[in-house]
């Protein structure tokens, strides 16, 4: 093909997809039916993971719950079974341990079936200055926040590829696209999770596996135990997200097969400005929004010696 023909094809496709995206901005996509889909959620013992499990159960999905917290995971299972007649399977799994992930994954495939919607939600946060963060906490952040994604994909993607059917969901973070002070290990691991999921999305499309979808979620701080005590200076501009709002938004994005979900909407503005304004301007904006002090109370509890599950590596 010559350059002129290639360019004409490119412009035609580009215009088509541009108009398509505008259309879906006005008229949302029809939500897909997840009845009978096998949905695996990591970090299902509490918070966002629990809410997502409850919402998927209400849509007729078969739930597979993973968490290192056996008691909390069984509580999620009990809540779902009490509220509705749903198929729910709970497994204790340490997502930071590759062998444990593969072992429990094999168990799931034998006892439940092939996972068709995988939601990598488990996460940990330290919330300390870089030089005050112990090495084992840095390693833990990467093992849970991103390496577990590699292992769950390895375990469940082959069956999706064979059937050309599935959905991969990465719960990254706003801290996975914008650096935030005193979250160096968390930001790095969430940047990695975002990049991994995006890379795999394009790899699958080039393999012509168009029926395997990806959704990458980048929320600002959610009001869960993981970020308890964090605050925001101007809630109207950059609010702490409620668990209900975050869970419903994520569910809608999955059902509409949306690739990116960034919350709240103002985050889009911050991300755009990051590309065009100077570093000093970025710092000024961060100070104005209070992002430089948003972890103050979180850090203070750390310094006071209070035991926090979020720094002890508990998956949430």
Curated annotation (Swiss-Prot):
Binding residues annotated for substrate, in chain numbering: 173
Keywords: NAD, NADP, Oxidoreductase
InterPro entries: NAD(P)-bd_dom_sf (IPR036291), Sc_DH/Rdtase_CS (IPR020904), SDR_fam (IPR002347)
Binding residues annotated for NAD(+), in chain numbering: 40-64
Membrane-spanning segments: none
Gene3D superfamilies: NAD(P)-binding Rossmann-like Domain
EC nos: 1.1.1.-
Catalytic site positions: 186 (proton acceptor)
PROSITE patterns: ADH_SHORT (PS00061)
Cellular compartments per GO CC: lipid droplet
GO MF annotation, one: oxidoreductase activity, acting on the CH-OH group of donors, NAD or NADP as acceptor
Coiled coil segments of this chain: none
Record-stated family: Belongs to the short-chain dehydrogenases/reductases (SDR) family.
Name recorded for this polypeptide: Short-chain dehydrogenase/reductase family 16C member 6
Organism: Bos taurus
Gene: SDR16C6
